[in-house]
Amino acid sequence: RGLGDVYKRQAHARKSIEILNAYSAMLKLIGPNDNDDPLCASLQGSMLANAAELIKHTYSKVTPAEIAGWEKMLRTVFIPVLNTFFKAKPYTNGNWGAAATKAYMAFGIFLEDEALYNQAVHFYYNGHDNGTIKNYIGENGQCQESGRDQDHVMFGLGNLAEACETAYNQGDEKMYAAFDNRLLTGYEYTAKYNLGAVSYTHLTL
Protein backbone atom coordinates (compact mmCIF):
# COMPACT_ATOMS: atom_id res chain seq x y z
CA ARG A 1 0.00 0.00 0.00
CA GLY A 2 1.11 3.57 -0.64
CA LEU A 3 1.99 6.19 1.93
CA GLY A 4 -1.41 7.79 1.41
CA ASP A 5 -3.13 4.59 2.56
CA VAL A 6 -0.87 4.41 5.60
CA TYR A 7 -1.67 8.02 6.49
CA LYS A 8 -5.41 7.42 6.12
CA ARG A 9 -5.26 4.38 8.40
CA GLN A 10 -3.34 6.37 11.00
CA ALA A 11 -5.81 9.24 10.74
CA HIS A 12 -8.71 6.84 11.27
CA ALA A 13 -6.95 5.30 14.25
CA ARG A 14 -6.36 8.70 15.84
CA LYS A 15 -9.97 9.70 15.28
CA SER A 16 -11.16 6.41 16.78
CA ILE A 17 -9.03 7.04 19.86
CA GLU A 18 -10.43 10.57 20.10
CA ILE A 19 -13.99 9.24 20.04
CA LEU A 20 -13.28 6.47 22.55
CA ASN A 21 -11.53 8.91 24.88
CA ALA A 22 -14.46 11.32 24.70
CA TYR A 23 -16.89 8.56 25.63
CA SER A 24 -14.75 7.27 28.49
CA ALA A 25 -14.28 10.78 29.88
CA MET A 26 -17.91 11.87 29.72
CA LEU A 27 -20.18 8.83 29.85
CA LYS A 28 -21.04 7.96 33.44
CA LEU A 29 -24.47 6.35 33.24
CA ILE A 30 -26.96 4.72 30.88
CA GLY A 31 -30.50 5.23 32.05
CA PRO A 32 -31.44 4.23 34.65
CA ASN A 33 -35.13 4.77 33.99
CA ASP A 34 -35.35 4.18 30.25
CA ASN A 35 -36.82 0.86 29.15
CA ASP A 36 -34.34 0.71 26.27
CA ASP A 37 -31.24 0.86 28.50
CA PRO A 38 -30.14 -2.75 27.81
CA LEU A 39 -30.53 -2.35 24.06
CA CYS A 40 -28.54 0.88 24.09
CA ALA A 41 -25.81 -0.70 26.21
CA SER A 42 -25.66 -3.70 23.89
CA LEU A 43 -25.56 -1.94 20.55
CA GLN A 44 -23.38 1.03 21.43
CA GLY A 45 -21.23 -0.93 23.84
CA SER A 46 -20.38 -3.67 21.37
CA MET A 47 -19.28 -1.13 18.76
CA LEU A 48 -17.09 0.70 21.26
CA ALA A 49 -15.55 -2.54 22.53
CA ASN A 50 -14.83 -3.79 19.02
CA ALA A 51 -13.20 -0.49 18.07
CA ALA A 52 -11.15 -0.51 21.26
CA GLU A 53 -10.00 -4.07 20.59
CA LEU A 54 -8.85 -3.18 17.08
CA ILE A 55 -6.97 -0.11 18.27
CA LYS A 56 -5.41 -1.98 21.18
CA HIS A 57 -3.83 -4.57 18.90
CA THR A 58 -3.11 -2.64 15.71
CA TYR A 59 -2.06 0.90 16.67
CA SER A 60 1.13 1.22 18.67
CA LYS A 61 0.62 4.86 19.65
CA VAL A 62 -2.38 4.22 21.88
CA THR A 63 -1.38 4.65 25.52
CA PRO A 64 -1.98 2.30 28.46
CA ALA A 65 -3.87 5.11 30.20
CA GLU A 66 -6.28 5.42 27.27
CA ILE A 67 -6.90 1.68 27.21
CA ALA A 68 -7.46 1.71 30.97
CA GLY A 69 -10.04 4.46 30.56
CA TRP A 70 -11.96 2.41 28.01
CA GLU A 71 -11.82 -0.64 30.24
CA LYS A 72 -13.20 1.34 33.17
CA MET A 73 -16.04 2.71 31.04
CA LEU A 74 -17.14 -0.75 29.94
CA ARG A 75 -16.96 -2.19 33.45
CA THR A 76 -18.69 0.69 35.25
CA VAL A 77 -21.19 1.97 32.67
CA PHE A 78 -22.11 -0.74 30.16
CA ILE A 79 -21.68 -4.08 31.89
CA PRO A 80 -23.84 -3.27 34.97
CA VAL A 81 -26.80 -2.52 32.69
CA LEU A 82 -26.47 -5.88 30.99
CA ASN A 83 -25.89 -7.69 34.27
CA THR A 84 -29.31 -6.45 35.36
CA PHE A 85 -30.84 -7.51 32.04
CA PHE A 86 -29.46 -11.05 32.20
CA LYS A 87 -30.68 -11.53 35.78
CA ALA A 88 -34.22 -10.30 35.07
CA LYS A 89 -37.13 -12.44 34.02
CA PRO A 90 -37.54 -12.39 30.20
CA TYR A 91 -39.52 -9.33 29.20
CA THR A 92 -38.38 -8.46 25.67
CA ASN A 93 -38.43 -9.80 22.17
CA GLY A 94 -35.42 -11.91 21.34
CA ASN A 95 -33.38 -9.38 19.40
CA TRP A 96 -32.49 -7.77 22.74
CA GLY A 97 -30.99 -10.92 24.22
CA ALA A 98 -29.12 -11.63 21.01
CA ALA A 99 -27.68 -8.11 21.06
CA ALA A 100 -26.69 -8.46 24.71
CA THR A 101 -24.93 -11.74 23.94
CA LYS A 102 -22.72 -10.25 21.23
CA ALA A 103 -21.94 -7.27 23.46
CA TYR A 104 -20.93 -9.45 26.43
CA MET A 105 -18.64 -11.42 24.14
CA ALA A 106 -17.04 -8.24 22.81
CA PHE A 107 -16.55 -6.95 26.35
CA GLY A 108 -15.00 -10.21 27.46
CA ILE A 109 -12.52 -10.23 24.60
CA PHE A 110 -11.39 -6.63 24.99
CA LEU A 111 -11.17 -6.91 28.77
CA GLU A 112 -9.49 -10.32 28.51
CA ASP A 113 -12.15 -11.54 30.91
CA GLU A 114 -12.69 -15.20 30.14
CA ALA A 115 -15.48 -15.59 32.68
CA LEU A 116 -17.48 -12.77 31.10
CA TYR A 117 -16.98 -14.22 27.63
CA ASN A 118 -17.99 -17.71 28.75
CA GLN A 119 -21.09 -16.31 30.43
CA ALA A 120 -22.22 -14.94 27.08
CA VAL A 121 -21.54 -18.23 25.31
CA HIS A 122 -23.50 -20.12 27.97
CA PHE A 123 -26.40 -17.70 27.55
CA TYR A 124 -26.35 -18.25 23.76
CA TYR A 125 -26.93 -21.96 24.28
CA ASN A 126 -28.83 -22.18 27.55
CA GLY A 127 -30.27 -18.80 28.54
CA HIS A 128 -33.89 -18.37 29.59
CA ASP A 129 -34.40 -15.31 27.36
CA ASN A 130 -36.13 -15.18 23.96
CA GLY A 131 -32.77 -14.24 22.44
CA THR A 132 -30.98 -17.58 22.82
CA ILE A 133 -30.32 -19.63 19.71
CA LYS A 134 -32.95 -22.29 20.45
CA ASN A 135 -35.55 -19.86 21.81
CA TYR A 136 -35.21 -17.32 19.02
CA ILE A 137 -35.22 -19.83 16.16
CA GLY A 138 -37.53 -22.83 16.13
CA GLU A 139 -36.65 -26.17 14.58
CA ASN A 140 -38.44 -25.20 11.36
CA GLY A 141 -36.57 -21.88 11.18
CA GLN A 142 -39.41 -19.65 12.31
CA CYS A 143 -38.06 -16.90 14.52
CA GLN A 144 -39.63 -15.62 17.70
CA GLU A 145 -40.38 -12.32 15.92
CA SER A 146 -41.41 -13.72 12.52
CA GLY A 147 -45.02 -12.74 13.15
CA ARG A 148 -43.97 -9.24 14.16
CA ASP A 149 -41.99 -7.74 11.28
CA GLN A 150 -38.98 -8.68 9.22
CA ASP A 151 -36.82 -5.76 10.34
CA HIS A 152 -36.65 -7.09 13.89
CA VAL A 153 -36.27 -10.70 12.74
CA MET A 154 -33.24 -9.88 10.62
CA PHE A 155 -31.86 -7.69 13.39
CA GLY A 156 -32.08 -10.61 15.80
CA LEU A 157 -30.52 -13.03 13.32
CA GLY A 158 -27.77 -10.55 12.60
CA ASN A 159 -26.97 -10.20 16.30
CA LEU A 160 -26.75 -13.98 16.67
CA ALA A 161 -24.54 -14.18 13.58
CA GLU A 162 -22.21 -11.52 15.01
CA ALA A 163 -21.93 -13.55 18.21
CA CYS A 164 -21.08 -16.65 16.17
CA GLU A 165 -18.51 -14.78 14.09
CA THR A 166 -16.94 -13.43 17.26
CA ALA A 167 -16.60 -16.98 18.57
CA TYR A 168 -15.25 -18.13 15.19
CA ASN A 169 -12.53 -15.48 15.37
CA GLN A 170 -11.63 -16.92 18.78
CA GLY A 171 -11.25 -20.39 17.27
CA ASP A 172 -14.72 -21.71 18.16
CA GLU A 173 -16.75 -22.94 15.18
CA LYS A 174 -19.42 -24.73 17.21
CA MET A 175 -21.75 -21.79 17.78
CA TYR A 176 -22.52 -21.49 14.07
CA ALA A 177 -23.49 -25.17 13.92
CA ALA A 178 -25.38 -25.36 17.20
CA PHE A 179 -28.64 -27.33 17.29
CA ASP A 180 -28.25 -28.79 13.82
CA ASN A 181 -27.32 -25.49 12.16
CA ARG A 182 -30.25 -23.66 13.74
CA LEU A 183 -28.94 -20.22 12.74
CA LEU A 184 -28.75 -21.23 9.07
CA THR A 185 -32.25 -22.69 9.31
CA GLY A 186 -33.47 -19.34 10.63
CA TYR A 187 -31.90 -17.48 7.74
CA GLU A 188 -33.39 -19.90 5.21
CA TYR A 189 -36.86 -19.60 6.71
CA THR A 190 -36.63 -15.81 6.74
CA ALA A 191 -35.51 -15.71 3.11
CA LYS A 192 -38.45 -17.91 2.10
CA TYR A 193 -40.81 -15.78 4.19
CA ASN A 194 -39.75 -12.69 2.28
CA LEU A 195 -40.13 -14.40 -1.08
CA GLY A 196 -43.63 -15.69 -0.48
CA ALA A 197 -46.07 -17.23 1.96
CA VAL A 198 -44.82 -19.81 4.44
CA SER A 199 -46.63 -21.41 7.32
CA TYR A 200 -45.99 -20.00 10.77
CA THR A 201 -47.19 -20.31 14.32
CA HIS A 202 -48.27 -17.30 16.36
CA LEU A 203 -45.86 -16.78 19.23
CA THR A 204 -46.07 -14.58 22.29
CA LEU A 205 -43.53 -13.16 24.73
Feature names for model-found ranges:
Residues 14-17, 21, 42-46, 98, ...:
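A structural signal for well-ordered alpha-helical segments within the folded catalytic domains
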Residues 143-203:
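Active-site/pore-lining binding-face segments in mid-to-C-terminal subdomains
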Residues 39-51, 88, 99, 103-105, ...:
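Carbohydrate-binding/catalytic loop surfaces
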Residues 5, 50-57, 106-110, 158-169:
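Short glycine/serine- and small hydrophobic-enriched flexible loop segments
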Residues 5-95:
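Extended ligand-binding groove/face enriched in aromatic
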Residues 2-7, 204-205:
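Short, small-residue-biased leader/transition segments that mark boundaries at the very start
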Residues 15-31, 69-87, 115-140, 182-198:
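Long, well-ordered core segments of solenoidal/helical folds
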Residues 13, 34, 38-41, 67, ...:
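Solvent-exposed, acidic/flexible segments
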